[in-house]
From Swiss-Prot:
It is found in: Secreted. Belongs to the parathyroid hormone family. Residues 1-25 form the signal peptide. Keywords: Cleavage on pair of basic residues, Hormone, Secreted, Signal. Interacts with PTH1R (via N-terminal extracellular domain). Residues 26-31 form a propeptide. The keyword Signal applies. Residues 84-96 have a biased composition (Basic and acidic residues). This is Parathyroid hormone. It comes from Macaca fascicularis. Parathyroid hormone elevates calcium level by dissolving the salts in bone and preventing their renal excretion. Acts by binding to its receptor, PTH1R, activating G protein-coupled receptor signaling. Stimulates [1-14C]-2-deoxy-D-glucose (2DG) transport and glycogen synthesis in osteoblastic cells. One of its GO terms (cellular component) is extracellular space.
Length: 115
């Protein structure tokens, strides 16, 4: 058996080690900043990939809907407020000539219809 004097020395050394390490009941292993940043970047990447996949599926549904030639459902006229011509003006009339804007609008519409 160990003498009491030696046991007291061992206990003092053990208490000193416990108080000087300052673990406070927390795990001693901590993650480095780069590891935390890597995990954060991975989370953002996975989130963005989920969003891209969701958007791809939605666009595929729209493409399939249009490709099948399904008629578009008419909008309920009661739910939309009537538009006034003044609400549609996006650019001041003196900034563009009427002919240039109309040609561009017609070109865009014909390209959209041909697709």
């Amino acid at each position: 058996m160990i003498p009491a004097k030696d046991m007291a020395k061992v206990m003092i050394v053990m208490l000193a080690i416990c108080f000087l390490t300052k673990s406070d009941g927390k795990s001693v292993k901590k993650r480095s900043v780069s590891e935390i940043q890597l995990m954060h970047n991975l989370g953002k990447h996975l989130n963005s990939m989920e969003r891209v996949e969701w958007l791809r599926k939605k666009l595929q549904d729209v493409h399939n809907f249009i490709a099948l030639g399904a008629p578009l459902a008419p909008r309920d006229a009661g739910s939309q407020r009537p538009r006034k011509k003044e609400d549609n003006i996006l650019v001041e009339s003196h900034e563009k000539s009427l002919g240039e804007a109309d040609k561009a609008d017609v070109d865009v519409l014909t390209k959209a219809k041909s697709q």
